[in-house]
Amino acid sequence: MACTAIAADSAFNGRWDITVTNEPRLRAWWLEVEGAGTSSIHGRFVGFPGGNMDPIQKIWVDGGALKFTFDNNRGVHQEYTARLAGSRLEGTMKEGATERTWRGVRAPEIADRDGAAWREGKTVSLFDGKSLKGWRGQVPGQALGWMVEDGALKSTGHANNLETDGKFWNFKLHMEYRVGPKSNSGVGIRGRYEIQILEDFGMPPGTHQNGALYSRIAPRVNASKPAGEWQTYDIRLVGRDVTVVLNGEEVVKGVIEGLTAIATDAAEAEPGPLVLQGDHGPVEFRNITLTALTK
């Protein structure tokens, strides 16, 4: 009987893409579990603790249920519980009197890998320099908070995130952006993986600094320009392979393990939109172009 329980517990192992199911605002989380069915269970999580990829503070399996807890960045205790339902996880998160429900599916294997075989298609402009055509607010009912001025797309700093109407899979993305002192933004590629934008000239590189794959891959060097100067991103995404060139300097070349906190759609095997984060400080964008990559 004990062997059967251990085998059942091991089914929690792996990476899970999670959708919160009882909120009007779409949210996606990510969970990794290792060692379930042994005495050395551990895990990592992207979600409500603060948007980082956090090591799970306490995790265990009890009576066929996976359980883990956090004390989040506001000092609030959170309890997560999940059970297997066929190939899915069905779970809850309790925080005081609030309860959220969620569903997890196994993160997909994505076969596409970057290399010389990929060919560039037609380059398209995603921003016409005059209007918000092709873009929409990510949160329904929330004020947009963006305007177009002098050929640039500008956020006041308390704006709705913007996302493209179109969805994309493998591509090269070029854009120019400008941030003010202490400002913070981000670019969501496929709407799931955030490339950080931060005013951090002269600071050490890190997983939350400019050029990072947010909370996952730190830039190799700090290639940022001072606040108020226009900067460039050239981002290449093929499958899970990502390359980030900041101001002409390659700062990231790696493999994306899973979702970051910008994600609202957990369907990693599907194309997704480009997202511009507008709620963390003033930021401007211009000359946004995308080139599809195909074989």
Regions found by a protein language model. Name each.
Residues 5-8:
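Boundary at the C-terminal end of the N-terminal hydrophobic targeting segment
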Residues 10-295:
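Carbohydrate-interacting regions of secretory-pathway proteins
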